[in-house]
Amino acid sequence: MSPTISHKDSSRQRRPGNFSHSLDMKSGPLPPGGWDDSHLDSAGREGDREALLGDTGTGDFLKAPQSFRAELSSILLLLFLYVLQGIPLGLAGSIPLILQSKNVSYTDQAFFSFVFWPFSLKLLWAPLVDAVYVKNFGRRKSWLVPTQYILGLFMIYLSTQVDRLLGNTDDRTPDVIALTVAFFLFEFLAATQDIAVDGWALTMLSRENVGYASTCNSVGQTAGYFLGNVLFLALESADFCNKYLRFQPQPRGIVTLSDFLFFWGTVFLITTTLVALLKKENEVSVVKEETQGITDTYKLLFAIIKMPAVLTFCLLILTAKIGFSAADAVTGLKLVEEGVPKEHLALLAVPMVPLQIILPLIISKYTAGPQPLNTFYKAMPYRLLLGLEYALLVWWTPKVEHQGGFPIYYYIVVLLSYALHQVTVYSMYVSIMAFNAKVSDPLIGGTYMTLLNTVSNLGGNWPSTVALWLVDPLTVKECVGASNQNCRTPDAVELCKKLGGSCVTALDGYYVESIICVFIGFGWWFFLGPKFKKLQDEGSSSWKCKRNN
């Protein structure tokens, strides 16, 4: 299952915890509208926020104080830019559910999951975006304008091809490779736009109002993800539209993916042109630069990661989320496979929003002390056990289906399961964020936190991809109705069908994977968990980076 509305951790792409990619449940900021952890989860969102709230330096006094009302237009522009950023993220999150409804393999789903990696990796090219620009045009507009033009043009072009790529025009199987390349580019461009907008926020707003930048980011990207994921899946579904929005049933939804792409591509082109022509950049930054250029930034990152305490943290956090990977990455897709309408799963994101707002506020009371990782350690076994509960939920799903639908009590159980899961996900997420803020060297806080959060995000991305990849190899199918045949390869499946048989699943790899992941997770908790907790006992000198200026 996957969270809905992404949380931003260093890689900003989906909210912590998910059922699947769109119902995203990955362990990072989760994108709205799904059950994916993915995505807690943008390069440096938390780092940027820390910089916004930290010491601003002498540059603060170069700007006259301005009221909120005086800068309302700039705040609304930032909000809108973040909404635009959420659109391609939401669309990318909806594709796995669409593919699952077309019965693609989990190997294909694993390949498509690479689409969600750019936000976790944007630290690799963020220094380039910060350092290379056309001065007369503007430091941030030099990247924002061309990036959004490319996004808009690409969306319009893709609107003419997407039906063919999904196999809608000729009843072929979806072209997963082409879809992955297209949406990987979407995510890469959205991540680049995020870097530019984050940087522009620091100069666009005065010192008094710069704190609104993180609010614009959170609200805007969440709204954009909701539009591109939850709203799109609902309006694209003929069943949903016929049941709730129409008087006369029709064979398709109110909008198609092609229509949606064309509309938002046009919006990107028009609004980007207006920004390029009408919005000027301020030249003075509200915050002090931590580094002096590309080379300096990469040297600093390398120096940080070489520190023994940081290296230990990275190795442990990269393996900590293996135990959750089957539940986070596969569960939502399995529910769709068992017949649960994808738009219904997406809409479960809506009642989760208040919970996802309240949880961090409550949990932060327990992570504000000197040992925030204690909360991570205590929440981990509950999240692992909920992974088994998810497997039971998938097993139970076909048993309660009635006349092609599911009773209301089924959705209540799913919603309660998801809510409990979110409590554990956010407990671990807020704990990690608090620890990263606690140990980050204040002299280089933004860069330091961005690095730690990026590694935390990668720790959720790679296990999810591997979990999807292993579902098919771990699944055992038998050929029923034809003697001396098996279903181990695609050719064997075809031969079984030609001989009058059919391939029946004898053992679903998802259940095997769920059990294996829980064993691995508890192994990590017993043997490596105490070592992970001990990191918070390290002295502050263990986390301070020595660098030559």
UniProtKB/Swiss-Prot annotation:
The modification Phosphoserine is found at S22, S42. Glycans are attached at N103. GO terms for cellular component: endoplasmic reticulum membrane; Golgi membrane; membrane; plasma membrane. Residues 1-46 are annotated as: Disordered. GO terms for molecular function: acetyl-CoA transmembrane transporter activity; protein homodimerization activity. It is found in: Endoplasmic reticulum membrane. InterPro entries: AcetylCoA_trans_1-like, AmpG_permease/AT-1, MFS_trans_sf. It catalyses: acetyl-CoA(in) = acetyl-CoA(out). Residues 1-12, 36-46 have a biased composition (Basic and acidic residues). Belongs to the SLC33A transporter family. Acetyl-CoA transporter that mediates active acetyl-CoA import through the endoplasmic reticulum (ER) membrane into the ER lumen where specific ER-based acetyl-CoA:lysine acetyltransferases are responsible for the acetylation of ER-based protein substrates, such as BACE1. Necessary for O-acetylation of gangliosides. This is Acetyl-coenzyme A transporter 1.
